[in-house]
Amino acid sequence: MVLPILYSFRRCPYAMRARMSIVRSGFQVEHREVLLRDRPTHMMKISPKGTVPVLLLPDGTVIEESLEIMEHVLSWDLTENEREWVRRNDVEFKFHLDRYKYPNRYDDIDELEQRAAACKFIESLEGEIPDGNLSDAIFPFIRQFANHNREWFDGQNWPNVHQWLAANLESEEFSECMIKYKQWVPNY
């Protein structure tokens, strides 16, 4: 039996999102761990944009977006509310997260202003903690934000977010999702 192939990078929150859905659904894949500075030729051939995750199905279908991978493996039909949460996470929050975490990559960026802007999304999560598939779509990004300055993050008055994030990070599914794989190297 030919398995679908998942190209992934362990620390990428988009790839985590896809892997969480794969773990939760029991969807079987051949996992190919890549380094983004050394992308495999096969991955670049099927997905020239060069980002992860990429799921190659046995019929040749290529799924290049993490949310689409979630939808495929979970047969998940997002509600309008779920789509809006994901949009806010992927567009608004991620914009500020990148500038907070990597201010040297951007011109005229104030790291603390970017953190404050990102906090608006987290404050909205505090009042409406996601669950199920939506939780898996969002928490990898909150994890990345929290890990940039864990002491500061833990000191914020977000008890619901802290509890939600801790529960996700302590789950068996997340541990399975974060198994360390050696870099995949083609054997030809």
Regions found by a protein language model. Name each.
Residues L97, D154, S175-I179:
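Short, hydrophobic secondary-structure boundary micro-motifs
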Residues E113-F121, Q156-E170:
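Extended, well-ordered alpha-helical scaffold segments
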Residues G127-L134, E172-M178:
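Surface-exposed helix-capping loop/turn segments at secondary-structure junctions
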Residues N160-Y188:
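Long hydrophobic alpha-helical segments typical of transmembrane helices together
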Residues S25, I46, G132, H148-N149, ...:
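Residues at alpha-helix termini
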Residues M1-E128:
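GST-like domain detector, emphasizing the conserved glutathione-binding G-site
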Residues N133-E151, N157, N168:
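GST superfamily/GST-like fold recognition
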